[in-house]
């Protein structure tokens, strides 16, 4: 056998070969013997070991061969085997080959060629460096052979190195084949099909790329061998997953780069070590991974092509997308990754996931993208993060779910139309970023939406929030677009303002502290306390009605003013009462609805108000309208006006439903009707501390107006009614006055106050026509009467009270006399006649004799007049129907003024006292009874 070129027997040494090491050549065979004689032995090989039937010696000349047998039995002796170039028997040896290693040549063609390198020691590391060559010496020899027990052996080849012959690691465990390199940037190729049983590289347990940064090993060809590759440094480039061997072998990224040159599909596991982010995956072709990526490391993606992940990955390090696209599909996810970081021009695409996915601590540069499709992305914020890219492309229906206690900031343009839910932590918007296309924005308890860093505020749709949630405005403006009804029970804070848009109702039932205004443009804003509208003072936190409505479902007092920039509605729920400082409607209409009460405490100004329901109290309000419509439209409810000035170009109050109007010390002016009722309405007008001369028109069918004149009231209104409507008047006490200046038709009157006929002239007098009943509550009626002869109807010049119904109670008649007086007694024999005198009150129903009486014994025209007009009562058949002023209703009781005097016996005598003495009548009043008896005869 040829001798070994180098024998390494010392542990843990490093050997560098810069020259050529050749194993000893085997000795040549002996010469064949002649026939019949023994042949001579062959000459020993130089430098090798030649066995000639005896123990070998190294480096010596071979012994002669034994003689051959006689005759034909003679033969040539076999040559010696080639020697090993380098024999490593020690442990921990590093061999750096920068030269040439060649096994020894065999002594004959039948002898064994020598191996280049034989390793029997453990933990060896053979490096075939750039330009290094390792050659076996023949077909059956090996370039490198690891003998049994030489475990943990590493064989590394570098760029432009040569290995000719088999590298056999089949007898050892934990062996590794390394594609290495030095500091130079090189591009090398390794053929995967050389790996496997019967191939050049046999028996390795592990495979590694560990070359210099920037250097690339191109792995081409295919193998079915189990080749679990680890890329530690440098780049491993593939065109097919088959180059990586059986899919049972995982690929580990340990700081190096896996590059896909073409589109590659892989079903193998990937492992990421703590060093993985020093390398990553470079996709020049799309890479689809359907198995799981695991490990404590992170995933860094470069290259313009797409990385597609379909496995339920559980690696825990960062995910960095430096270029290209990361595409998640099916159940694919990266929810265990510490963070997801997108560079400019990159994207995270979840549109093909089964049900959306979750990422932690999402960040993105301007120009990055999150593609949602119709899926929802959950962003779990374990630390504060900012995404400055586009979250959701135009028209995408997916949405955002924010979890985690930290803050997630959207700083780019977001176009997704699905919901935004902040389950925990804070979702912040900054700059021009907004989520105004998101269908709904929901905040869970303790979650926050922060818009304080936006340029000009933002808009959100259908904002909802649990109790304990927060919206932080800073000094910005939040617009809530309510496309559907929503409830926000959290707190809105900051110096900013709130605008409500959209046709849906938005409910604020939390305690808010924002300092700015609240403006309602569309739909309804529902509140239950003044704090629902923030904590600002009335100078900077007013409520502005800009086309929408306010619905109140709580009782509270507010110091805010309410301004109307458009027609608007304020509704108060049943059993609730809400008061405000002032209202300012401008030229717009304010509508009060709901069954509760709304109070305006300190006036303001208004041009048109409609009360649809409930109660509305206006205190010291100035109302002035040039509109043709009514100033106050009352459909239903109670309208209280206390103080202030109210004037209208047309109707002042138009009533279309059952209602009550209470006026107290209001200055009223109307060019049209002061009050007008439509069909089928029952309404009450109550007056207190009030003077009003507004005309009252009850024109509708089946409508009823009840007028209550209370303390310190003067009602000077002209009242008109249709035949099918009703006016009932109640003068409640002796400070209640009703001044009549024209013919007036009413239905029922209760008089505990004063009815006063306004004086006109000697030829014009008015009638009070009462269609129904009259109740006297010790009130008075003041009438203007010309004291003349009377008699015929056209000669009875006086205001009259004409009652078609019944009369109850008592009333005092105060007659304001005109004229010179005359003797009304015209009947022969100087007797009482129901045709004589002047009728003041006619009753179609029943009335007691004392239902009406004068405020004195008699009326005269002056202190020296001989004519004493006394009030007499005629009833039934005694009534002269030719003096009927009731029209189609016969007069049943007629109260008439007639001249009469008391004779010396105290009897009432018709006519004039023939013994009249001026000295008895200095004051024009008698001293006898007020009225005659019921039959018209004096008592």
Regions found by a protein language model. Name each.
Residues 1-5, 18-87, 98-122, 131-150, ...:
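Glycine-centered low-complexity coil/loop motifs and glycine-rich tracts
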Residues 2-11, 86-89, 119, 273-275, ...:
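Extracellular beta-strand-rich solenoid/capping regions of secreted or surface-exposed proteins
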Residues 15-20, 208-213, 282-284, 296-307, ...:
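Parallel beta-helix/beta-solenoid
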Residues 119-137, 142-148, 171-221, 226-240, ...:
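Extracellular beta-solenoid/beta-roll
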Residues 215, 231-236, 256, 303-305, ...:
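Glycine- and acidic-residue-biased ligand/ion/polar-headgroup-sensing regions
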Residues 351-386, 430, 452-489, 493:
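Thr-biased low-complexity repeat/linker tracts and other Thr-enriched repetitive architectures
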Residues 912-923, 932-939:
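Outer membrane beta-barrel translocator domains of Type V secretion systems
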């Amino acid at each position: 056998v040829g001798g070994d070129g180098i024998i390494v027997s010392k542990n843990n040494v490093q050997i560098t070969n810069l020259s050529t090491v050749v194993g000893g050549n085997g000795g040549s065979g002996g010469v064949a013997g002649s026939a019949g004689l023994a042949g001579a032995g062959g000459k020993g090989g130089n430098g090798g070991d030649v066995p000639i039937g005896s123990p070998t010696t190294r480096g010596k000349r071979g012994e002669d061969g034994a003689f051959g047998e006689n005759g034909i039995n003679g033969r040539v002796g076999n040559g010696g085997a080639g020697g090993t170039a380098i024999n490593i028997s020690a442990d921990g040896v590093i061999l750096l080959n920068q030269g040439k290693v060649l096994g020894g040549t065999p002594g004959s063609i039948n002898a064994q060629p020598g191996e280049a390198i034989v390793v029997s020691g453990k933990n060896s590391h053979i490096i075939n460096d750039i330009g290094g060559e390792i050659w076996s010496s023949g077909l059956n020899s090996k370039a490198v052979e690891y003998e049994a027990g030489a475990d943990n052996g590493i064989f590394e080849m570098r760029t432009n190195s040569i290995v000719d012959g088999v590298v056999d690691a089949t007898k050892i465990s934990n062996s590794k084949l390394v594609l290495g390199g030095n500091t130079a940037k090189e591009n090398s190729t390794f053929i995967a099909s050389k790996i496997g049983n019967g191939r050049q590289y046999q028996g390795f347990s592990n495979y590694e790329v560990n070359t210099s940064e920037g250097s690339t090993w191109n792995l081409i060809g295919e193998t079915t061998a189990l080749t679990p590759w680890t890329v530690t440094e440098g780049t491993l480039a593939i065109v097919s997953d088959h180059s990586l061997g059986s899919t049972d072998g995982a690929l580990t990224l340990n700081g190096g780069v896996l590059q896909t040159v073409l589109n590659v599909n892989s079903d193998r596991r990937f492992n990421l070590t703590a060093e993985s982010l020093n390398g990553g995956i470079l996709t020049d072709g799309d890479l689809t991974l359907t198995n799981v990526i695991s490990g404590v490391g992170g995933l860094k993606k470069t290259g313009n092509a797409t990385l597609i992940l379909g496995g339920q990955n559980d690696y825990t390090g960062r995910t960095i997308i430096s270029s290209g696209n990361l595409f998640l599909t099916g159940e694919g996810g990266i929810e265990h990754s510490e963070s997801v970081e997108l560079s400019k021009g990159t994207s995270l695409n979840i549109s093909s996931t089964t049900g959306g996915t979750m990422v932690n601590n999402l960040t993105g540069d301007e120009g990055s993208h999150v593609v949602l499709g119709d899926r929802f992305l959950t962003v779990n914020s374990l630390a504060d993060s900012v995404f400055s890219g586009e979250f959701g492309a135009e028209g995408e229906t997916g949405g955002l779910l924010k979890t985690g206690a930290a803050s997630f900031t959207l700083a780019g343009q977001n176009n997704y139309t699905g919901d935004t839910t902040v389950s925990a932590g804070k979702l912040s918007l900054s700059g021009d970023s907004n989520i105004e296309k998101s269908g709904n924005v929901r905040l869970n308890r303790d979650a926050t939406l922060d818009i304080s860093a936006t340029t000009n505020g933002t808009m959100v749709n259908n904002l909802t929030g649990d109790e304990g949630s927060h919206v932080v405005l800073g000094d910005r403006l939040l617009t809530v677009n309510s496309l559907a009804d929503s409830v926000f029970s959290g707190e809105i804070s900051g110096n900013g303002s709130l605008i409500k848009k959209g046709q849906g109702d938005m409910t604020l039932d939390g305690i808010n502290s924002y300092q700015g205004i609240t403006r309602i443009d569309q739909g309804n804003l529902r509140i239950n306390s003044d704090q629902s509208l923030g904590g600002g003072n009335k100078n900077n936190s007013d409520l502005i009605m800009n086309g929408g409505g306010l619905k109140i479902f709580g009782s509270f007092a507010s110091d805010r003013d309410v301004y109307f920039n458009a027609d608007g509605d304020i509704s108060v729920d049943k059993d609730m009462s809400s008061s405000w400082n002032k209202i300012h409607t401008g030229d717009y209409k304010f509508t009060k609805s709901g069954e509760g009460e709304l109070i305006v405490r300190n006036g303001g100004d208004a041009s048109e108000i409609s009360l649809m329901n409930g109660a509305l109290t206006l205190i010291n309000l100035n109302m002035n309208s040039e509109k043709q419509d009514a100033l106050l439209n009352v459909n239903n409810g109670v309208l209280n006006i206390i103080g202030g000035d109210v004037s209208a170009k047309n109707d002042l109050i138009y009533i279309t439903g059952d209602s009550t109007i209470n006026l107290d010390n209001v200055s009223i002016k109307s060019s049209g009707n002061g009050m007008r009722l439509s069909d089928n309405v029952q309404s009450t007008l109550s007056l207190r501390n009030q003077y009003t001369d507004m005309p009252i028109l009850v024109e509708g069918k089946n409508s009823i107006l009840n007028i209550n004149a209370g303390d310190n009231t003067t009602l000077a209104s002209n009242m008109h009614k249709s035949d099918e409507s009703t006016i009932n008047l109640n003068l409640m006490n002796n400070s209640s006055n009703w001044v009549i200046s024209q013919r007036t038709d009413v239905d029922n009157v209760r008089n505990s106050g004063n009815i006063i006929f306004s004086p006109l002239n000697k030829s014009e007098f008015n009638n009070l026509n009462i269609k129904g009943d009259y109740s006297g509550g010790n009130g008075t009626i003041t009438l203007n009467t010309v004291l003349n002869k009377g008699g015929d109807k056209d000669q009875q010049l006086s205001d009259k009270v004409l009652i078609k119904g019944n009369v109850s109670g008592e009333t005092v008649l105060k007659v304001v006399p005109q004229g010179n007086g005359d003797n009304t007694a015209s009947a022969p024999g100087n007797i009482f006649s129901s045709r004589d005198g002047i009728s003041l009150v006619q009753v179609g129903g029943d009335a007691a004799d004392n239902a009406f009486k004068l405020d004195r014994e008699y009326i005269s025209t002056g202190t020296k007049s001989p004519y004493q007009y006394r009030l007499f009562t005629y009833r039934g058949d005694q009534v002269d129907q030719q003096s009927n002023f009731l029209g189609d209703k016969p007069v049943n009781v007629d109260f008439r003024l007639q001249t009469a005097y008391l004779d010396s016996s105290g009897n009432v005598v018709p006519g004039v006292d023939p013994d009249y003495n001026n000295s008895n009548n200095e004051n024009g009043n008698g001293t006898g009874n007020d009225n005659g008896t019921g039959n018209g005869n004096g008592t």
